[in-house]
Amino acid sequence: MRTMQTITLITPVVLAFMSFIQPAFPQESVPESVVFEKNIEYSNPDDQHLQLNMARPKVGAEPFPAVICIHGGGFRAGSRESFNGLCLQLAEKGYVAVTVSYRLAPRYQFPAAVHDVKAAVRWVRANAAMYQIDPERIGTTGGSAGGHLAQFLGVTRGVKKFEGDGGHPEYSSSVKCVVNFYGPSDFTKSYDASVDAKDVLPLFLGGNLQQQRHRHIESSPLYWVTPDAAPTLFVHGTNDAYVAHEQAEWITERMKAADVEATLMTIDGGDHGFRTSSPEVKTMIDNARLNFFEKHLKK
């Protein structure tokens, strides 16, 4: 029996939605125990030469589990460089961690970004032997728009229509687990609950809810939840002005109904990116992510 848990550090729910704000990870120097490689091309859709950065342990018990890190930015901005610090932290803990670029709106609308992150997972599997990765132990994490894309990976395992043509089609794009930081789950309920959804979503989906209702549904992870979805840790604040805390509640309950493991960690007063949260709360969040990956990716 799969389980659902809720870690409640708060009670009120504040309506909100999506932005360019990203979690702040220290861009520290590369630790002696880590190999850090940048600008590795993983896919080339429409001559875009998509790249990733990779951090991996120099030594340890090979093969290593891997984590795909996906940046936020409202689907129209952001950079993989913002997750370099997280990748270095994960590599110190025994993971091969990659932070990936993907195609952005408005030039590239849904599902281009989904195709790209799935191509990144397939690339990691195709190159597992080269980088001492266990292809059966790949997880993902992301924040805001990146949380949405990470969640989409987790709920569309085996759904061929979203694979795209980004290379290595013989490999699976499935992930074993997801850590979703304040990513939206249902775009059909966003316009009145966010400071910028009316500006962001039409760029990503080709129109507003009235014009493109089908695409709003098709791009919402909530509607793709099945018993095959990956176990997920949701981390969300109650004072998020861009992605409402209730977005995490809805998909947690949907996964519970499908008998999929889901944990909602609610941060009392947490904003989008947890920038105003105390160092103690940020440490607690970091530990929760590591513990979740330890549970699902470490042997």
Per-range role (PLM):
Residues 1-9:
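Positively charged n-region of N-terminal signal peptides that target proteins for export
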Residues 25-299:
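Alpha/beta-hydrolase superfamily serine-hydrolase fold, recognizing
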